[in-house]
Every structure is written in structure tokens, then in C-alpha cells.
């Protein structure tokens, strides 16, 4: 008797959206400990591969890139022409959408997709993935900045990273003074 292997899920993280809506927000900022976040994605959502999309490379952020990779994420940088590097914001939405659709088109062997962003630009992708039974969950970094386009999405398809039951598992713990 052959045991069927459970398909592993894939996560796509919009790195700028995650950072801007947690650590960089004006009210009650908090930092995610990337290693704990990666483990959370694996344990809670059976994520085998987690792609962390960033806007562009800059040597001054090399330490950050190493932290992201050490935590178990696969970094994907947005392609820019040499003249535009450093002048554009991240805007990785189309890259994430294309990557997800390419995997579907090529019939890549995976379970479902988990998306980490509050950006409304992913709404059509989310709707299509639900229709194709290939969508697990969208994790909004911040309730206040989650796009209103997702309001009609059933609660089984989303959660907020700032919710206490998630935040306590992934938040960077502040070191206590000696």
C-alpha cells in the first residue's frame, strides 16, 4: 500500500508591506523575529518554501538579507534597471502574482498558497486561487492597513499577524536590561 505524500504549501511574503505595517508603523510598532515567523508558517500552515520578496538589492542591507536567509526564507529581489536601483519603492506585487500564476500554469506540485500582505493588489489573485482550491490564507500584518477589498472574504481565508495568539509566537522579544 502506497502512502500519499501530503502536498506542502508555499508562502509569498511582500517584504516591504510586512515591514511597513509592523516595525515602521507610527502607532504601536513591533518587530517580527524572522526565524520564529518561518517556524510559525511551517507548523501552522505546512509551508515548505517561503519566498520573501524585496524591492531591490543594496549592499548596506546585506545583514538584513543574511538574517532573512538564515531564518529559512528564499529571497526574491525585484528586477530594476541599473539606472533606477535605489530610486523605486519595492512594489513586488506583480512579481508575486506572476510567480504564483506561473506555478499554477506549470502545474507545479504544491498544496496551497499563503500570502503575507495587506495590499489590495492581490485581490484578483486571491479570488482565483480560492476558485482553484489553491488558496490557504492571507496574513495581514496590520488590521488597520488591510485593504478594504478583502472585506467580503470569508474569515477562514485571513488572519492578522497582530492578533495576540499569533504575535506572541512571532514577535521579537525585547532583551531585558541586566
Features from the language model and the residues they span:
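A generic secondary-structure signal
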Residues: 40, 99-103, 128
